[in-house]
Amino acid sequence: MGILSNSMADQDTEQVAIQFYWDVGSTNSYFAFHLLRPIAEEFGAAIEYIPFNLGYVFRHHKYVLSEEPKAKLKNRATDLKRWAKKYSLPFNVPEQFPIKTSDALKGSLVMRRFGLEEAYIEKLFSTYWEDNDASIASLDGLLPLAAELGVTETDFIELLRSKEISEQLIDLTQVALSNDIFGAPTMVIEGEIYWGKDRFDFIRDHLLDLSK
């Protein structure tokens, strides 16, 4: 599951795991998804993708994005465009925001069964945050993504609607809360939490220390 790299760390050491808590409805998860993978590859670390219901976590903490200072929200789009330009990412602010993401998140757990989790997540992020396509909020919008990766509509729907997959997403969200995960993206290395898309220098330092 995730990246399994052999680059910098071809040593007789146990592979480091990076837990990546994400929600496709999180703008910063989009950036973190693209920025984390090269670092993981460089250090031979494995990324463990952990979907969780960010909206539920926000409600648990009584946080409402729209209630942030208007000046901050006004600057948000400009700041995101700066990030996209800096890292040469084809990011676009979607017209429809926020969206429901529970089916999309459950879909990643379905695709994990087929060894296609990371490829599916990449399609989710590109569809919504690059193509301005909010159809991923519905099952009908997810089916073409699964089909492009070779999973039949029947298999995808059957698993997505299963009690097991639904309970798995609920459990992962509860695990996130119990582990003090309060937002997305959150990366965890050896129990140490790194929150946000601007923490990769610290993540690199952590991995560098482990490689010594």
Where are these regions (language model features)?
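Structural alpha/beta surface segment adjacent to cysteine/selenocysteine redox centers
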Residues: V24, Y30-D131
